[in-house]
Amino acid sequence: YPVLESVKGQIENAYKILETCYENGGKLLIAGNGGSAADSDHIVGELMKGFVKRRPVSTELAEALKQADPERGEELAKKLQGGLPAIALTNHTALSSAFANDVDGMLSYAQQVNGYGKAGDVFLGISTSGNSENVMYAAVTAKAKGLKVVGLTGKTGGKLAKLADVAIIVPEQETYKIQELHLPIY
């Protein structure tokens, strides 16, 4: 994707942040709206299981599974895969609807960052404009809790680009074109 050459450095910086997070036992929290919510879910699907090649569980876990239940443990040891911890904040309908009803729906992602996030984790905010308020509230909460913030945006990068530790601002203006360029990045 030659069009992404201009954001190569930002992609590499985001990778380094994620690598450090995972090396230190952290997790990735992801949020977006509409197509960006779908991207959030897609990213989790790729990280929590093998992608391109199988990720076997550790020998220690395989043995513990067999010890816990020799019959099922053998199957689990063969079929489970190592995952990189990631949570799409877009999928918790009961929590989101209860928080929207009882408190403020705009803060649903922020509430989840508050509940799940810890220093050393990473928040990935996906917003084609960089100005989605609910994503911004989550990003502010993440920063306050000591999480690194990565923004995946387009256009000018918006408010999210200014707050993020790393902002990947794809060089497009139209929403569907921005979303098309987000896909090869993740």
Task: Please place each PLM-identified region on the residue numbering.
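Short glycine/serine/threonine-rich phosphate/pyrophosphate-binding segments
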Residues: 37-41, 106, 131-138, 160
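A short, well-structured juxtamembrane/interface segment
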Residues: 6-24
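Generic N-terminal amphipathic, Lys/Arg-enriched alpha-helix
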Residues: 1-5
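Glycine-rich, small/polar surface segments that engage phosphate groups of diverse ligands
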Residues: 20-116
